[in-house]
Amino acid sequence: MLGWSCEKEALPTPTMIETEASPEPSIVFRSEKDSVPTILGAQRNNPYTVSNMTQAWNSLFGQHKTYAALPVTHQYVKFDPQSLEEYKALAESGITYVDFPLGYEVVQLGDYYPQEGVGPEGIPDFYGVLEAGEPVPAVTYQVLEDLVIPPYETPLTARAFEQVGGLSSYFEGLGGTGVSAIPDPCGQECPNYPNCFYFPQHFGCSGPPTYNGDCTPDSPDWPDCLVIYDDEEEELNDCGCPVPGDVRMPAGCIQVQDVERNGLFPVEAVRVVWWNGWFTFKTAETDARGCWQIKDHREHGKAYMWVSFRNDRARLRGFVGNTVQVWRLLATVTDYGGELGGGSYNNIQTEYNLWNNQGGRDHRNWSAATVMNALHHFHTESQNDGINPPPMGLDIYLTAYRRDGIALMTSQIPVQLLEQWINQGLFNSQLLPNVINSLLVIPDVAIGCNFQNSDRQWAITQHELAHTSHFTNVGAEYWGALGLATLTAFQMTSYPWGWAGVPDAGRIAICESWASHLEHVYTDRAYGGNNSIPFDWQIRLERTRNHRLNHVPIGLHFDLFDNQNDLNDACDRVIGSGCGPIADNVAGFTNGELFSILDENTTDPDIYQARVINDLLPGSGNTVADVNALFNSY
C-alpha cells in the first residue's frame, strides 16, 4: 500500500461474505443501476414569489397588518461556472445545488440532467436556493427569483397555492384528494378562519383567531414561527435510531456492510440532503449511530433524498471514468437515494452493501462509506494516543481500480512545491490516477478502493491518514522534500519507496514506516481477530522487519512500545529481501511520545534513534544498549 506514495502489497485474494439478514425497514434505498437522466415535465406556477406571498398575507391578515412586500427569505439562483476554478469553489462551499432547474414537474429524477450545448469539456449550469444574505463562493451566478418560503402546513402557504391555481395540488401534498371550494360553514366571519378552511379535520369555525401577532414578517424567527412542531414520543428502529412519532418528520439511518465483522455498521457524519420538489432543501448529518433527523421540517407528498459524503473533516470525490466530463473530478461523491411518497418519512433505512460491479454505484458508495468510517476511527485513535489528527477539510479522491494511495497535502502546501513535483514528473509517474493530470484537480489524498474486504480498505485509509497527521508535525518544506525523494526513487527503481541507496532514503524510511505502523495498529484496534489476513494486523506487524533490506523499518515503532520479545525471525515485506532475529528488549514508549520526536528535524532512522535515546530514554526503564540493539536489528 502507498504512503506519500505507498507501494502495493501482495495480500491474499479478497473474499466475499454475505451479511446477516436484518429486519425489513419501512423504506430501503439501495440498488445497482446504470446512470439515468433526469426528466422534467411542465413548469409549475410558483406560489413562493414575493408578490404572491405578499398578496396571500394581506388577504389573510391585512386587517391586522399589511405589507407592500414581504421580506425575502430565500433566493433561487443559477450558478454558471465559467471555469473549473469557479466550479471547484462551488463544490467546496457546502452549498446544496442540483444540475436541473427547479419549479418543474419531476417525471424522473436521475443522475444527470442533459443540458444542450454542454460538451465533454463544458461545465453545466447548476441551481440552488440560498437563504437571504447567505454568502456566495467565487462563482458566477444569477438570482432567478426572490422567494418567501414559509412552512408548508400553514394557512399562508395554502393561500399562496390557491392564488396560483394550485390548491388541489396543495391538498394532495397533505395526503388529501384536493378541494376547490370553501366548505360551509367556514367563512371569513369565523374566528378560526382560515384554519377551518385549510385544515377542517383539525379546526372548526369557532376557536382562537388564526392571526398570531407574535409571528409576523418583522419577527426575528420569521417564517419558522408560523408553525410549532410537537415533540412526539419516539421508538427505536432496527438500526437503534429514534423513529419520530410524527410520520411526516424525515428521519432514518445509514449503514454499511462490514465484511470481516459480518454485519451492518453505522455510517457516521455524512450529509443527508432532502428536497421537497419545490424550493426547500434541508440537510442533516448522521451521528455516531448512523442516525439522522430533520427536526424543523414536515414533508408532504413527493420528496427526494441524497447522501453526500462530506463533513468538516473531509470531502470525498472521485470514482469517475477516464472519459468523464472534467468538472465531475471535483464533485463530491453523492448517492441519490430515491423518491419518497405516501406520507411516511420517519424510518428510512439506507444500506451500502458489498459491491460486485467494479466501478459501479455500489462500489462507489460502499467504498466511500467505509473510508468515511475509517477517517472517524483515525481521529478517535489519534486523540486517544495523543498525536495530531489529520488537518480538517481534507480533499480525498477515491479511485476504483487501484490498491495504492498517496498523501500530497495539496491544499496545505505552497504551489511552488507542487510545481517542483510536477517538474520532477509527477503526472508521468503513475503515482496518481490517470485522470488526475492538472494542478487544479490534485487532491490532498488519493485512496485506492479496489478492495472487497473491509479491513483492507480500512488499512490503506489509516496509512494515508497517518501521513496527513505526520504532515502537521513536519510542515510543508519537509513534505516537499519527501515528494521529491519519492519521485526520484520511483524514477530510479520503479518503486515509490525505492531502496536504501536512493537519495534521501532516510526520509522515505521514516515517513513510510510510521504510516505503516499506525496502519496496522489502528486497523487491529478496529478488527482484532476479525480480518481477512492469515493472522491479525498486530501480529502481522510484529512479524515484519523492513519493507526491503535495510530500508523502511516497518516493525521498529511497535517494538519500541510492545512488551514482546519475538523469538521468531521477522521478515522484510518484499519477498526475497530476507529475515532475521529482532533484539527486542525495549518496551513502554507510547505512540504519542514517538510522534513528538517525528518532527521536521527527524529525517532518517539514525536521527530517530538518537532522539529516542536523548529525548525519551530518561526515566523510561530502558537502556541505551537495548535501544541500539533494537535499531541495529533493522
Named regions from a protein language model:
Residues K295, E351, W355-Q420:
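Zn2+-dependent metallopeptidase catalytic core
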Residues T410-W458, Q462-G475:
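Active-site scaffold of zinc-dependent metalloenzymes
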Residues N276-K295:
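Short, acidic Ser/Thr/Gly-rich low-complexity loop/linker segments typical of extracellular
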Residues G3-I27, S206-T210, T216-P220, Y229-D246:
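Bacterial Sec-dependent N-terminal signal peptides
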Residues P12-T15, G240-R261, N356, T370-Q383:
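A short, Gly/Thr-enriched small/hydrophobic beta-strand-prone motif that recurs across taxa
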Residues P37, G41, N45-Q55, S59-F61, ...:
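Short, ordered, surface-exposed loop/turn motifs in non-cytosolic proteins
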Residues Q293-Y304:
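Short Pro-Gly-centered beta-turn/loop motif in secreted/extracellular proteins
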